[in-house]
């Protein structure tokens, strides 16, 4: 990539099975789940941590105190999905949206995937199973680079390499979003139990840094809202 890799990009790329022909089994599964909510939360976390948006109280008439997003001065990020979200935050019509509503209505998977295709990191591929039935999927343009990303993830989550702050953020997003099934080792893979232990450990380590440009509590509130969206009682 020619610029900083966002949390959402990394999560989406990790959810794509490896194409390495030497591996008989893909080392990670790609089950249906709550990936879209988690990718949307990743975009929000990125914007809050960079100081582009703030999480502010929004007292509702019926539901008491909730939180929403507020733009902190428009500065393009260079990422199409992030800038699209910034534009939505700036729209006065969205001023009363709660954090949970921001997570539900994002369409993040499509936006992040389309951006990666546009930038030549992923390519559109269609599998034909009959004259009229086709299955669309996005595949890495450079399998070696994709394999390196997956190996880096395994080094941290299976082989206990010292994590970066972004690794801890990935763990926190996966745990809060209940989306770990997108990157979990396939059942029966050695180290699967350790993976879950490591995931919880790194999630607990995640402590967003606070600076004059942003409030670390905003990230915590995004993760808490993500957990509520994915709670069994939420219906999702």
Regions picked out by a protein language model, each given a short descriptive name:
Residues 1-104, 218-236:
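Short, amphipathic alpha-helical interface elements at domain boundaries
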Residues 38-42, 107, 111, 168:
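Short, well-structured alpha-helical interface segments that form or flank functional binding sites
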Residues 87-141:
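Internal, conserved structured core segments that host functional sites
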Residues 57-83, 123-155:
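Accessory beta->alpha helical hairpin/"wing" motif in late/C-terminal subdomains of nucleic-acid enzymes
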Residues 6-28, 98-100, 129-161, 165, ...:
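Intrinsic, low-complexity N-terminal interaction/targeting segments
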Residues 44-47, 116, 169-175:
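Short, structured motif recognition centered on aromatic/hydrophobic residues
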Residues 137-236:
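Glycine-rich, aromatic-bearing surface loops/beta-hairpins
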Residues 51, 120, 178-181:
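Short glycine-centered helix-capping/turn motifs at secondary-structure transition points
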């Amino acid at each position: 990539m020619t610029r900083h890799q966002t949390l959402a990009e990394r999560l989406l790329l990790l959810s794509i099975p490896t194409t390495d022909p030497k591996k008989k089994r893909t080392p990670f599964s790609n089950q249906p789940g709550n990936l879209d909510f988690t990718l949307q939360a990743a975009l929000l976390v990125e914007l809050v941590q960079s100081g582009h948006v703030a999480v502010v109280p929004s007292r509702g008439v019926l539901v008491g105190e909730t939180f929403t997003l507020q733009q902190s001065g428009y500065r393009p990020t260079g990422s199409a999905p992030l800038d699209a979200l910034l534009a939505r935050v700036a729209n006065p019509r969205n001023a009363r949206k709660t954090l949970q509503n921001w997570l539900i209505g994002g369409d993040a998977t499509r936006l992040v995937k389309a951006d990666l295709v546009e930038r030549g990191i992923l390519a559109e591929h269609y599998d034909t199973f009959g004259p009229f039935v086709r299955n669309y999927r996005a595949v890495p343009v450079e399998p070696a680079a994709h394999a390196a990303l997956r190996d880096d993830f395994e080094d941290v989550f299976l082989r206990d390499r010292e994590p970066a702050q972004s690794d801890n953020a990935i763990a926190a997003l996966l745990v809060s979003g209940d989306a770990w099934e997108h990157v979990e080792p396939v059942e029966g893979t050695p180290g699967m139990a350790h993976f879950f232990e490591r995931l919880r450990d790194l999630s607990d380590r995640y402590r967003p840094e606070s600076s004059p440009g942003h409030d670390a509590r905003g990230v915590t509130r995004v993760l808490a809202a993500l957990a509520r969206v994915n709670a069994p009682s939420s219906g999702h």
